[in-house]
A protein has these predicted regions:
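Bacterial N-terminal signal peptides that target proteins for export
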Residues: 1-9
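Beta-rich carbohydrate-recognition modules and glycan-binding surfaces
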Residues: 2, 19-185
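Bacterial N-terminal signal peptides
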Residues: 8-18
Length: 185
């Protein structure tokens, strides 16, 4: 009887480890099942800018991903292209950051978080990341996100996060960034 209990205990521990790891992270998006209904493309043209681009949803083998491409132009007070998703629910209260799997054209890109407190269109919390040519796991703690202005809190309130945007921003350049997964940790 004791060997059977030992085997049962090992089985429970083995099963419990993945369950614990899963409970500590929340997957937000894997770009499967009609992601075009959840994501939208936005450019500085909404304010007179000249940037152009698009978001495409692609797959390589069994891996679905989104690709943000375009030309970012700072002419005419512009300077961004973005793919944005409104969250179906806020992140878990104990989440400490955002996780992405990305690749790109060796350029710097940004995540913009909007919260209940970002009322004006130009308000957001921003953190940057580099997108190398190979798929890379990026972790951005919420403490790394900086407000776009003085009227916002210093860091976003986790339970108030309403949307996530992947953004090519702030300088003239050709953008291409692929995103395979987004989640909270």
């Amino acid at each position: 009887m004791r060997p059977l209990l030992k085997i049962a205990a090992i089985a429970l521990l083995t099963l419990g480890i993945p369950l614990t790891a899963t409970a500590q992270s929340t997957m937000l998006e894997t770009f499967e099942n009609t992601p075009e209904t959840r994501w939208r493309f936005i450019a500085d043209t909404v304010m007179g800018g000249l940037s152009r681009g698009q978001v495409s949803f692609l797959a390589e083998g069994s891996n679905a991903f989104a690709r943000l491409t375009g030309t970012v132009s700072t002419a005419n007070n512009g300077g961004f292209i973005q793919m944005r998703m409104d969250l179906p629910a806020p992140p878990p209260a104990d989440a400490t950051g955002l996780r992405l799997i990305v690749r790109g054209n060796d350029q710097r890109y940004f995540i913009h978080l909007r919260t209940a407190g970002t009322v004006l269109p130009w308000q957001y919390y921003q953190a940057g990341f580099d997108a190398p040519g190979e798929w890379t796991d990026i972790r951005l703690p919420f403490s790394a996100f900086k407000p776009s202005g003085r009227l916002l809190r210093n860091t976003p309130r986790t339970t108030g996060i309403k949307s996530v945007g992947i953004v090519a921003f702030g300088r003239d350049h050709q953008a291409q960034v692929d995103v395979r997964e987004i989640g909270f940790y």
